[in-house]
From Swiss-Prot:
The gene is psaI. The keyword Plastid applies. NCBIfam families: PS_I_psaI. Coiled coil: none annotated. It is a single-pass membrane protein. This is Photosystem I reaction center subunit VIII. Keywords: Chloroplast, Membrane, Photosynthesis, Photosystem I, Plastid, Thylakoid, Transmembrane, Transmembrane helix. Its main location: plastid. The chain crosses the membrane at residues 10-30. May help in the organization of the PsaL subunit. Belongs to the PsaI family. Pfam families: PSI_8. One of its GO terms (biological process) is photosynthesis.
Length: 36
């Protein structure tokens, strides 16, 4: 059961969460550079 459900949850999670974290970190980095 778990072996078939896990990929269908993990793939969208990685596909959505990882880019969101990357965008957020880049946004914060740019904001930090502009303030200084």
């Amino acid at each position: 059961m778990s072996a078939q459900i896990l990929p269908s949850i993990l793939v969208p999670l990685v596909g959505l969460v990882f880019p969101a974290i990357a965008m957020a970190s880049m946004f914060l980095y740019i904001e930090k550079e502009e303030i200084n």
